[in-house]
Amino acid sequence: MYIKVKFLKNGEPHGREYTYKSTFPVRVGQEVILPGGGNGVVTEINVPEEDVESFKDKIKEIESVVEEDEQ
């Protein structure tokens, strides 16, 4: 599934949304670990494939989901 994520800065969502692929079950508001080790928060799930068609070959996949007790 395609999701939208905002990077975390000082623990708060910051900046614009970026699109990632996720093979993990995620929900809006959940913290995820991004490629390269940064963290972000999910702002949208189930982004339609037609919305990302023009750049889907460049979309990276999230590395994992931060479990609630890890936050």
Task: Set out the residue ranges of the language-model regions.
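Terminal, basic amphipathic appendages of nucleotide-handling enzymes
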Residues: 2-71
